[in-house]
Regions:
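Short beta-edge strand/loop motif at the mouth of beta-sheet-based domains
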Residues: 23-24, 43-77
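Hydrophobic/aromatic beta-strand elements that line small-molecule binding cavities or substrate pockets
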Residues: 24-26, 75-80, 105-112
Length: 160
């Protein structure tokens, strides 16, 4: 599946004009298909993502909801999907609170197979300078990606 469909018009400029705020690169000793499957798994709670479940069809134009303990924590919209290679979605912290007021941000996963290793690049853009989401993201992604790597390479997850 490689597609882009109707995107919320308010999000389209965000999608096309963002400069990256954070770029994380991690190499995972697993096939690209296994890494992709973990990223788009909508059936299981993700122990590697601090017990977060993602509810989504992962189809462009569709919604994505991150749930912790059965409660929506983050919502977004899938903007692009190219199976096994790329996924782009918006990321908006649920309100009320100061993080909610910071507006939507943009997350992009890019996967490349290199021999028996997958190079996963995560780019997070449109974060408010000095904002609380930016602060949380700066420490959150390294932990989440380390958890994904641990889970895929040895079956163990990290706990916070």
């Amino acid at each position: 599946m490689s597609a882009t469909t109707a995107i919320d018009p308010e999000i389209l400029p965000l999608h096309k004009e963002c400069e990256p705020d954070f770029i994380y690169v991690i190499y995972i000793h697993a096939p690209r298909d296994a890494v992709w499957a973990a990223l788009v798994d909508n059936k299981n709670e993700r122990a590697w993502w601090v017990n977060t479940r993602m509810n989504s069809t992962f189809k462009p134009g569709g919604s994505i909801v991150f749930e912790k303990a059965g409660k929506a924590d983050v919502r977004g919209q899938i903007l692009e999907r190219d199976d096994g290679k790329r996924l782009v979605y918006t990321f908006h912290v649920e309100g009320p609170g100061p993080q909610h007021d910071e507006g939507p941000t943009l997350v992009e996963y890019t996967l490349e197979q290199t021999d028996d290793t997958t190079k996963l690049t995560v780019t997070h853009s449109n974060l408010k300078k000095g904002g609380r989401v930016r602060q949380a993201i700066s420490g959150g992604w390294p932990f989440v990606l380390s958890g994904l790597k641990s889970s895929l390479e040895g079956g163990k997850t990290l706990q916070r």
